Amino acid sequence: MGKIKIVVSDQQPFMIDGIIGFLGHYPDLYEVVGGYKDLKKAIAECNKSAAQIFILGEFAGGMMGAELVKWVKSHKIDAHIITFVAKMPYIDSIKLLEAGAKGCVWKTSHPAKLNRAIDSISNGYTYFDSVHMDCEKISSRYSSDNQLTNRESEILQLIADGKTNKEIANFLQLSRKTVETHRLNIMKKLDVHSGIELIKTALRMGVCTI
């Protein structure tokens, strides 16, 4: 597998430089093909370079959150969007998902979370920063015929944290097949058919906050 191509865009040049500098510590993993204050130029670079990841920052006096993601997606880019934003009340995680974002990382978070977001999304998963889930609260939302077990609740938390089946298996000391079975059971109980729907449902239930 080759390097992951990344484009960065933010209204603040020092933020762009900071992200590029951080990702530069991993030359074998990432190739930053451009960093732009001008959003239209960033989108053009995504299309020109066939970037896999677009780290989308904030822009004053205009669109924000899901509205901004929709506008970027309207330009038909193939890159997966990670929003890189300040932790603010206007950020609605469900709307970000529905708009087409694959992840969100807070600017106040540890830089390692940006690594996790990029790696998770590149492997077909979503990643939303600071997802905290209350396993007891999850279980209390269900009647006895479809209640999640404690193990299923634990796995749902790890899925929402952006962990892959393999990572969950290693963390819980289970086989990958067992984790896959639990995941299918969770999706059946919640009546969802994709990873994105799974996270959306958890958010709507109020069992996690982003």
Swiss-Prot record:
SMART domains, per database record: HTH_LUXR
Domain of life of the source: Bacteria
Keyword list, A-Z: DNA-binding, Transcription, Transcription regulation
Pfam families (UniProt xref): GerE (PF00196), Response_reg (PF00072)
SUPFAM superfamilies the record matches: C-terminal effector domain of the bipartite response regulators, CheY-like
Molecular functions per Gene Ontology: DNA binding
PROSITE patterns given in the database record: HTH_LUXR_1, HTH_LUXR_2, RESPONSE_REGULATORY
Nucleotide-binding found in the keyword field: no
Heme listed as a keyword: no
Domain HTH luxR-type intervals: 141-206
InterPro entries, A to Z: CheY-like_superfamily, Sig_transdc_resp-reg_C-effctor, Sig_transdc_resp-reg_receiver, Tscrpt_reg_LuxR_C, WalR-like
Single GO BP term: phosphorelay signal transduction system
Response regulatory domain location: 5-122
DNA-binding segment(s): 165-184
Protein name per its UniProtKB record: Uncharacterized response regulatory protein YgeK
Organism: Escherichia coli O157:H7
